[in-house]
Design a protein with these regions (language model features):
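Generic alpha-helical secondary structure signal
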Residues: 12, 22, 37-40, 72-73, ...
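Periodic aromatic/glycine/histidine/acidic cluster detector
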Residues: 20-26
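Short aromatic-glycine-(Arg/Gly/Cys) micro-motifs in beta-strand/loop hairpins
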Residues: 26-50
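N-terminal cationic amphipathic segment used for targeting or macromolecule association
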Residues: 4, 33-35, 53, 59
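Mixed-charge, Lys/Arg-enriched low-complexity segments
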Residues: 44-92
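Generic detector of leucine side chains in alpha-helical contexts
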Residues: 1, 13, 32, 39, ...
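Generic preference for hydrophobic/aromatic residues in regular secondary structure cores
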Residues: 3-5, 25, 67
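Negatively charged, low-complexity tracts enriched in Asp/Glu with abundant Ser/Thr
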Residues: 1-20
Length: 92
């Protein structure tokens, strides 16, 4: 079981196609936190991945998720809207 603890709007104007995406933070039954982005980024193989982060606190999971997102968009300079996909609204 996981409980949604928080949802954050993250503004990133340099790489993201719309300047903003969301991160949800979940807490599991062991008290650990996981963050997931609602934006998915293409990798070198053409597969899409969302940013995922972990932590012992809500804040550390959020920071780790943002760091993972920035790592996902660091492998090339010129990003197009087609390089991103959005999670289903019902999933987020």
């Amino acid at each position: 079981l996981e409980k949604v603890i928080a949802e954050f709007d993250v503004w990133e104007l340099n790489k993201s196609p719309y300047g903003k995406f969301k991160i949800k933070i979940f807490q599991d039954t062991k008290g650990l936190y996981t963050g997931y982005s609602n934006i998915q980024v293409i990798d070198e193989t053409g597969s899409f991945y969302c940013a995922v982060g972990y932590g012992d606190t809500e804040e550390s999971a959020l920071n780790d998720t943002i760091k993972h997102y920035l790592k996902l968009v660091s492998w090339k300079e010129d990003w197009q809207e087609s390089d991103f996909e959005w999670s289903e609204g019902t999933d987020f």
